[in-house]
């Protein structure tokens, strides 16, 4: 089978992980295995743990990683459960972990998943098809206040009140069933000037609903905490984000990992006992170059941040 998936910032991620052929690595967002293939083929006696909440990704990876399955373990799970996954896999410490956040290209391209505002499909948006909450429930059941909040907080949508009001008004007549129905409602709630902007008028709203359905932002803090705790000294944590909300959480978490004593400056000696867990290797995020952007426009918003577990911090 021809392999055409283009993983974002691939070379930069491999360099960031500073790989050893006998190391233990975690790809916490397997997707279509683009990064995992590159990691797996660099291992000899090492091991790769691949995690994804989307069973379709796990199934596809069995073929795409077939030549290296002797060193690969596939796990169907949410990366928020990273600590438990590592324990279950018998991993006492990893030498590198990679997380490529957000919705994957195959999920966007499969209209039936309901992620796209360009193709008609039932309102779903679940990354894990076995999860109970769908976009249909969010759109048709959640209150005006809840809708306005997620549109504003998760979508950074300045027309959140008007869009939330339009959704509630529309569903009073009949349930909103499909993605393009929702797109029309969103467009109808926005002023003409907003419809002429370069960005699709439904992009921010769809992002907000998707984040709410999948609990994406809520999963980040426990994952980041478990990741740094699960690294061996000198191990690397690499995280790719695609929008400012994710990037802000990752940036602050890594800054906190690198921060030592938090005692007030007037204290003569440290009493908090806090020591840095990691050091930042990227003061500014790594972004895609022009060559990658020409081949893969979806890489335009990608930002890679990297931290390294401190040698003097015990697991």
Map each language-model feature to its residues.
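S-adenosyl-L-methionine-dependent methyltransferase catalytic core, i.e., the SAM/SAH-binding region
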Residues: 1-315
């Amino acid at each position: 089978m021809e392999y055409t998936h283009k993983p974002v910032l691939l070379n930069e991620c491999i360099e960031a992980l500073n790989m050893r052929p006998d190391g233990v690595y975690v790809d916490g967002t397997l997707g279509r295995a683009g990064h995992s293939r590159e990691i797996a083929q660099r291992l000899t006696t090492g091991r790769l743990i691949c995690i994804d909440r989307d069973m379709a990704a796990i199934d596809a990876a069995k073929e795409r990683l077939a030549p290296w399955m002797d060193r690969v373990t596939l796990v169907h799970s949410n990366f928020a459960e990273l600590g438990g996954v590592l324990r279950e896999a018998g991993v006492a410490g990893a030498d590198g972990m990679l997380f490529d956040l957000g919705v994957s290209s195959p999920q966007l391209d499969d209209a039936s998943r309901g992620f796209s505002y360009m193709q008609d499909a039932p309102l779903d948006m679940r990354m894990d098809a076995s999860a109970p909450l769908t976009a249909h429930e969010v759109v048709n059941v959640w209150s005006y206040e809840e809708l306005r909040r997620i549109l504003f907080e998760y979508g950074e949508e300045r027309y959140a009140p008007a869009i939330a009001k339009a959704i509630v008004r529309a569903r009073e007549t009949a349930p909103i069933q499909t993605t393009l129905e929702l797109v029309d409602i969103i467009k109808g709630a926005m002023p003409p000037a907003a419809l002429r902007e370069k960005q699709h008028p439904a992009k921010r709203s769809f992002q907000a609903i998707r984040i709410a359905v999948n609990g994406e932002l809520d999963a980040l803090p426990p994952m980041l905490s478990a990741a740094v705790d699960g690294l061996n000294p000198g191990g690397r944590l690499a995280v790719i984000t695609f929008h400012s909300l994710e990037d802000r959480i990752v940036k602050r978490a890594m800054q906190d990992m690198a921060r030592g004593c938090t005692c007030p400056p007037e204290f003569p000696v440290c009493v908090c006992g806090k020591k840095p867990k990691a050091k930042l290797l990227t003061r500014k995020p790594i972004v895609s170059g022009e060559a990658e952007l020409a081949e893969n426009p979806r890489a335009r918003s990608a930002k890679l941040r990297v931290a390294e577990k401190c040698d003097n911090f015990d697991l």
